[in-house]
Regions:
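Small-residue-enriched hydrophobic alpha-helices in membranes
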Residues: 1-71, 81-182
Length: 182
């Protein structure tokens, strides 16, 4: 648990250096209002995940992460071929996910995307069940959420739909969305 405590301290320091979450005054706009801090959060989470690379080698983490990535990609209800290919390339180039053979990652990601495209609610239920399998290992559970945030924020657009999906995944894992500034 010492590693996770260090990560939480780093995140807290990052949040304090940003002056808290309400630094945008009375402006509204959801994720847009905190665009700069979101980018910093994504960068910090990516670094934190990298520091856990040696611990994140289980099949449960791999499968849950691919389910999370598929949910993020399909958060708006559809995944066009260009988006699918873009997310797939981010997955296989992700430092932590390089613990796994790229073909395993592609296969699991595409299976979930296909299910979500065919029947979103059923696919979502199956993906959430896959994610929930990591709930008993807090480091892996948090890493799944962090992976989702990193993938969602990679294009600079962390949409409300993506945030909602990640909040639901937090609930499936028994984690507070506030822990991830959601």
């Amino acid at each position: 648990m010492a590693v996770w405590d260090r990560i939480k301290d780093q995140a807290k320091t990052l949040q304090q250096s940003q002056g808290g979450r309400g630094a945008n005054g009375g402006r509204s706009g959801g994720a847009r209002a905190g665009g700069g801090s979101r980018a910093q959060l994504v960068s910090a989470l990516k670094t934190q995940l990298g520091s856990l690379k040696t611990e994140l080698k289980s099949g449960a983490y791999r499968d849950a992460s691919m389910a999370m990535c598929a949910l993020v990609a399909a958060a708006d209800g559809h995944v066009d071929p260009a988006e699918r290919q873009h997310v797939e390339s981010m997955i296989v180039s992700n430092d932590v996910l390089q613990n796994f053979p790229p073909e395993q990652l592609r296969q699991r990601f595409n299976k979930h995307v296909d299910q979500l495209t065919h029947n979103f609610q059923l696919g979502k239920t199956e993906a959430m069940q896959e994610i929930a399998k990591t709930a008993k290992k807090p480091t892996e559970a948090r890493a799944v959420i962090q992976t989702g945030i990193v993938i969602a924020g990679a294009d600079g657009d962390f949409s409300q739909a993506e945030q909602m999906i990640i909040r639901e995944a937090c609930a499936a894992l028994g984690l507070s969305p506030a822990e991830f500034q959601l």
